[in-house]
Amino acid sequence: EPWLVKRPFTAEGLVERYLDDVFGLGPLEDMLSDESITEIMVNGSHSLFYEQEGKLYQAPHPFSDDGQVYALIDRIIGPLGRRVDESSPMVNARLPQGHRVNAVIPPLAIDGPVVTIRKFRSHAFSLDEMQDLGSFDKKIEQLLKWAVLRRCNIAVSGGTGSGKTTLLNALSAVIPFSERIVTIEDSAELRFSEHPHVVRLEARPKSAEGVGEISIRDLVVNSLRMRPDRIVVGECRGAEALDMLQAMSTGHDGSLTTLHANSPQEAVSRLATMVRYGAELPVAVIEAQIATAIDLVVQTTRYPDGSRGICEISGYVWNEEKRHCVVDRYYIRDTVTKESSWIKIPAWLDDLPYLGIAAAKEVAQWKQM
């Protein structure tokens, strides 16, 4: 059922509405508490949309004027010491629950202040739960678990809203409790409710005075001095890609990250571009490092019915003759029909018995699935 206003016009309901206005985020409180809603979009005072189970719905607009939307923005960013005004009309923030907020005001937002809230579940999905929901089958679930335990460097690639962060979180939950994890994010979204040894780092934007910025790249470089067993970067989107690839290639195996790309091949191009933000290296040199550093690229997608899942799993190999990083496809799933097929089996699966991760019989049974 699409979301409906849950505060009745009774004395008790009116008191709850008043308390929401004074202490919470006003008319958005009901949506924030509804676990089935994943995104809230306020387009000025005249338009409110939300995403529920992968589909967009329009809600009754609860704001009487733009002033209420401005008050909402101030309520969010005020405690963080941030501001939004004509000189700085865009801001990113995080709610105490971990939800990510983006606000844009005029003159950039022509029709009034815009607020977008990306919600995150209080309980992170496990690989088991994602498999139960149909994001992938049991064969892929087992492959992903083995890949994490084998300390493969994994990049989760996908478009906006395709479930990259959800999958990254589920993969991270497989990391053994005996290992020290350092997570690095632009806005903290990953959740490690059970792992006993997690250090969470969050980038810091410039202050209102234009100083004090700490970038993802700064944190990646610093994390190498923190004795990490695993480095998890929420999303590679800039010059930090160079340091991430170097870390993956020089002993910090088992690292995880996400990339905004629509295919594993596009991910190579995106990574090469990002590396060049930080160093003027030849493309062939960069692609050779990508082929060396990344063991597995998992492509996520959003299907036409609104569901999310894995549509491709690949590796990378270096083609010396063409001086090019080539996608080595293992598995594909059609993004329309959802029909899937295995093209080949990753060679590293045969290492698992020798590493004590899985018995030879288990691997053989997996190949027959």
What are these regions (language model features)?
Residues 185-187, 191-195, 199, 223-318:
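Conserved P-loop NTPase nucleotide-binding/switch module
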Residues 156:
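Hydrophobic anchor at the beta1->P-loop junction of P-loop NTPases
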Residues 1-57:
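N-terminal anchoring/assembly modules that precede and organize ATP-driven motor systems
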